[in-house]
């Protein structure tokens, strides 16, 4: 009887360990996805400024009349 109870407790502990390991893995994956989201957001802000500046320069160049001399 003691061996059966001991075996059941070992099985329960291993299931808890597997559950904790699964949650830790899930947490790590979520952290990595969050870091990727932040990296994309940080990288896109300067790109947005550059594209805006280029389009502003192009629009002002097209808006000014060209005088032939």
Swiss-Prot record:
Transmembrane residue ranges: 32-54
Cellular component per GO, a single term: membrane
Subcellular location per the Swiss-Prot or TrEMBL entry: Membrane
Membrane topology, as annotated: Single-pass membrane protein
UniProt entry keywords in alphabetical sequence: Membrane, Plasmid, Transmembrane, Transmembrane helix
Main location: membrane
Domain of life: Bacteria
Protein name in UniProt: Uncharacterized protein y4kG
Organism, scientific name: Sinorhizobium fredii (strain NBRC 101917 / NGR234)
């Amino acid at each position: 009887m003691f061996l059966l109870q001991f075996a059941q407790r070992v099985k329960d502990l291993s299931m808890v360990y597997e559950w904790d390991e699964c949650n830790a893995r899930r947490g790590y994956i979520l952290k990595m996805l969050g870091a990727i989201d932040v990296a994309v957001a940080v990288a896109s802000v300067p790109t947005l400024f550059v594209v805006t500046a280029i389009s502003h320069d192009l629009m002002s160049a097209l808006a000014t009349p060209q005088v032939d001399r």
